[in-house]
Amino acid sequence: MVLPDIKKGKDMINILPFEIISRNTKTLLITYISSVDITHEGMKKVLESLRSKQGIISEYLLDKLLDESLIDKDKGKEFLITTGVINKTKTSPLWVNSVIISDVPHLFSNAREQWKCDGVFVSHIIDIKDNNINVSDSTLIWLHLENYHSDIVKRIYSKFESNPGVAFIQSYYLKESFRIDGVYSPDLGTPCHFCHIERWLSREEKSFRRNEMSWANLLQLLKKYQMTLPALALGESERGFSYHLIKRRLQELTGTSLVKSHVDNFMSSVSADLITCILCKEPVIHWQACSCLER
């Protein structure tokens, strides 16, 4: 299966989340950064149109909406930017496409449509069992596993890491935590999954010494007997929480980010405690025993 390129054009407009509340003759615009009373009937029509198109649209389409409502284009766009309804993007994304490869592909059956409003464009959802996976250059590959095994990650890496511009990000479950690695980009030389996991295992070994019940020993045992590590007691709410975190991370990396991102976020891992719902971000550096820098 060869996946086609899906490219975003230049001079695109990000439509950010907003709401319009109308009662009698009063119309209130509410965004993350402001709340404004809207009296201009033409602007009300523009906002209603934009609300139905949340995500990314061309600047040409926005100009057309403003023209139809007899609103000066420059002043109209300035108002929408100032109030937090839109922002502009002219920079090219690092990745043209993003795909999700998973052992639970049904979990993402609605993601392609649902996530568009956040500027997240996933070209394909692929079952890990598919032996005929091919991806185009400049693709971000998200590998999501409910049954973790390091060999699965190695197989995906070895198949695609020589493709120009391809990068990887993994999500999986360990103990009571849902984990999302930082982005591994062979082109940029960022740390890979095994830099993340080996550093975590090293901490486990130091904490539990040679305790046979440690998770480090359990992972080594499962690896020896070619067994996967299943997620513990996952229900619909835990899956929904993980699904939301995946969407937000993809939005931060490829979509319409709601916050300004620092370069450290690119390399940071995310760990979410499924019991306490506490979220932690941690920058990850290369693990000295990992060979990803030599690949």
From Swiss-Prot:
| Keywords assigned by UniProt, alphabetized | Antibiotic biosynthesis, Cytoplasm, Plasmid
Which GO terms are recorded in the biological process aspect for this UniProt protein? Answer: antibiotic biosynthetic process
Cross-referenced InterPro entries:
McbB
Location in the cell reads: Cytoplasm
Gene Ontology CC terms, in alphabetical order: cytoplasm
KW Cytoplasm (keyword) present: yes
Major place of localization?
cytoplasm
Functional description taken from the UniProt entry: Necessary to process the inactive microcin B17 (McbA) precursor into the active peptide.
NCBIfam families of this UniProt entry? metallo_McbB
The protein depicted here goes by the name Microcin B17-processing protein McbB
Task: Identify the taxonomic lineage of the organism of origin.
Answer: Bacteria, Pseudomonadati, Pseudomonadota, Gammaproteobacteria, Enterobacterales
